[in-house]
Design a protein with these regions (language model features):
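Short coil/turn segments that connect the beta-strands within blades of beta-propeller domains
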Residues: 53-54, 101-103, 147-149, 195-196, ...
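Blade-level signature of beta-propeller repeat domains, shared across WD40, Kelch, NHL, RCC1
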Residues: 310-338
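Loop/turn residues immediately N-terminal
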Residues: 62-65, 111-114, 157-160, 204-207, ...
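Short loop/turn segments that connect beta-strands within beta-propeller blades
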Residues: 70-74, 118-123, 165-169, 211-216, ...
Length: 338
């Protein structure tokens, strides 16, 4: 009888241990894999990336700005680079964006003013100088026509700032012809635009949404969010994602009546600084935690699809079926295997 009891006790102990280990074993059925295509050494930290066809513009931190050709994706070719001295700035470059229709490149000196670079004469990069206000955290560029563009800046001092430029054929220069400021609910540190909708992130004060109609921009509402609202990504005129650092991320609706109903918080346990969107794929930049992948499940939930330790990630973008990750280790290009 004693022998049977001992054997039964031993069996139960094994069963308990087996059950515990089966519970803590990760379920890999719904995880997505990252397949590396190429890793580009960018000298300085790769802080940001902008893709336009086969051209990849890189904000290379202390190394300035770089232009890479990815006509052959597995063998990128460096076309040119501009150091901080050549750009006429002192601090690292943290953002780049390119207006392909007018062939103008824009970069941001960290916590300073945006920088304008003319690329209309082929591969020659002609620095036009800086504009707008100091303490610009992020900006967007919209072209008005072939000879005009407007820069929308998240000015950490003054709110939403607009600067319009027009090209003068006689002088072969771009001139700042108009501009004004719109006070925001707090000090903005991020911006995104889709159609007539503009959203600013306001750090501890959440976000503020604006609407543009017939050249007049008005504030529509402000939403307080957990954490520090860092960056916003608009996916259409009705929805957008907000990276809120240690509070993870939120998906929100732009309609005033839909604010509470459309609010979804996810990645609560991660430090999120940016969100890239490609249909059903979300790529969250998580600083030292790498890159986290998520998938929206309809309109009510967002599911985790894996965290990938690829180094310190600042920013990510989707383009042409690839995921471009701007990291301290350089620019890394991946394909997602679902």
């Amino acid at each position: 009888m004693t022998v049977i009891d001992i054997r039964m006790k031993h069996y139960l102990n094994l069963l308990i241990v087996s059950t515990i280990f089966s519970c803590i074993e990760p379920n890999s059925e719904n995880l997505w894999m990252l397949n590396e295509v190429v890793h580009i050494e960018t000298e300085g930290y790769c802080r940001d990336v902008f893709i336009s066809g086969d051209s990849v513009f890189v904000a290379a931190g202390q190394a300035g700005v770089q232009l890479w050709d990815i006509g052959t994706i597995t063998a990128p070719n460096l076309l040119w680079k501009k150091s901080l001295a050549e750009l006429g700035v002192n601090k690292e470059i943290t953002q780049v964006t390119y207006a392909s229709s007018i062939k103008q490149l824009f970069a941001l000196e960290s916590n300073e003013r945006p920088l304008h670079i003319d690329l209309s004469t082929g591969d020659t990069a002609r620095v036009q100088g800086q504009f707008s206000s100091e303490k610009t955290k992020e900006f967007r560029v919209l072209t008005n026509d072939g000879n005009s563009f407007t820069v929308y800046a998240a000015d950490n001092d003054d709110g939403l700032k607009l600067s319009t430029f027009e090209y003068d054929n006689g002088f072969d220069l771009w001139f700042n012809t108009a501009g004004y400021e719109i006070a925001s609910f707090g000090n903005p540190n991020g911006i995104d635009i889709y159609g007539n909708e503009i959203v600013l992130t306001l750090d501890q004060l959440g976000i503020e949404a604006f609407h543009s109609e017939n050249g007049i921009i008005t504030s529509r509402y402000q939403i307080d969010l957990e954490g520090n609202a860092r960056a916003v990504t608009m996916i259409n005129g009705g929805e957008f994602y907000v990276a809120c650092e240690d509070a993870g991320a939120f998906k929100l609706a732009t309609g005033i009546s839909d604010q509470l109903e459309g609010k979804i918080q996810f990645a609560n346990d991660l430090f999120v600084t940016h969100i890239a969107v490609n249909n059903n794929q979300l790529a969250l930049s998580c600083a030292s935690n790498g890159l986290a992948l998520y998938e929206p499940d309809g309109n009510t939930s967002i599911s985790a699809r894996g965290i990938h330790d690829i180094g310190y990630v600042y920013h990510a973008e989707f383009s042409g079926g690839y995921l471009f990750a701007a990291t301290r280790e350089g620019l890394q290009i991946f394909e997602i295997d679902e």
